[in-house]
Amino acid sequence: YPGASIETDFAWAGKHPMVEGYKAYRKMPYDRPTWDMMSVLYVLRPEMFGVSEPGIICVDDQGYTYFTPTPRGKHTVLTLTPGQQDAVLRFFVRELSSKPAKYR
């Protein structure tokens, strides 16, 4: 998620949990992937993503994940073409930073 949006697009909210989480994690501004939101978006809009071939996901001792394709694998990962990446980013900036109708 773009740090510039975190800094400017949520002013309507006072203390927004997404903004506060980003600030607590690291000194602003910085851009950061948002895997949890991507997985939610995949449930709602699967056409915005691709899905990898089957494989196995392993987590190492430092917490890094690795995907190894294998025909008998039970895992897949979401994939994005450059066009899909741009569309997802635009969607997130537009939807996540907009003021909910309840508060307009």
Descriptions of predicted regions:
Residues 1-104:
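N-terminal acidic, glycine/proline-rich low-complexity segments
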